[in-house]
Amino acid sequence: MTSNLFQPPSMAASRGAISRRTGNVKVLVSFTSSNGKTLSFSDNSFRLRPMFIGKVTEQSSCSSPNEQQQDEEQEQEQEEITVSHIKEELYEALKGINRGIFGVKSDKKTEIEGLVKLLECRNPTPEPTGELDKIGGCWKLIYSTITVLGSKRTKLGLRDFVSLGDLLQQIDIAQGKTVHVLKFDVRGLNLLDGEFRIVASFKISSKSSVEITYESSTIKPDQLMNIFRKNMDLLLGIFNPEGLFEISYLDEDLQVGRDGKGNVFVLERIEKP
């Protein structure tokens, strides 16, 4: 999953293959890793700029040490540009979809998840549970494949008088705790800061995943509890983080994770509110 998979050890290794169309771009990226396995991503449409694709530098066996150092520096610089452009395209793709909570069109979903996979292949932190300081803090959800549709949306009042605000994840590494906060705005009750709060604990499960255990949940203020009382189980069933959570991409300001049900979560780091 790390970036060196894109750097073939010799000229005999496969080079990335890219096909482009104007407008939406169909990207086919395939490469052969050092262990002989062929990895590929295809059938995903992206709106990518030409400079998005990283150049794979070939190193000749007769290159001088200085030339090899220059090649390595160029590769590192190109990789940073590539990740930067993936993130830029991802943020652009996420505009106007309200985090995907109420569903997105299939072509848009394919575009977003294709960009997420490209990011995961460039993960600068392949063993995030060994660098917990990078995980701690406050994160805001900007995309998820979890959806609230149909009767669920109606029962929770999300069609009429209840609006979803930010979905936050506050991670306390020292305590081994995570607090998930779902903000609400209820029209007519003048509640600008109502929230549904889920407290959970976590423990390291592997080099890239944690096991999350639900502990408690509350709704504030009391007026909101009166609204959601009959549908608390439904609300908790949608947003309960319990289970295995794999951190598949992590840098200073962006996190991608996948839960045990296959749902994708993209979060950006923010200052604690």
From Swiss-Prot:
Q: Does the keyword Transport apply?
A: no
Stretches of Acidic residues bias are at 69-80
Mind telling me which Pfam families this protein's record contains? PAP_fibrillin
Gene ablation phenotype (knockout): Seedling lethality. Severe reduced growth, strong reduction of levels of plastoquinone-9 (PQ-9), and loss of plastochromanol-8 (PC-8) in leaves when grown on MS medium supplemented with sucrose. Severe decrease of photosynthetic performance and higher levels of reactive oxygen species (ROS) under cold stress.
For this chain's UniProt record, which GO biological process terms are given?
plastoquinone biosynthetic process
The entry's cellular-component GO terms read: chloroplast; chloroplast stroma
Keywords tagged on the record: Chloroplast, Plastid, Stress response, Transit peptide
Q: In which tissues is it expressed?
A: Expressed in developing roots, developing leaves, young stems and sepals.
Q: Looking at the record's lineage, which domain of life comes first?
A: Eukaryota
Interval spanned by the transit peptide? 1-61
**What family is this protein classified in?**
Belongs to the PAP/fibrillin family.
State the protein's name: Fibrillin-5, chloroplastic
Organism, as annotated: Arabidopsis thaliana
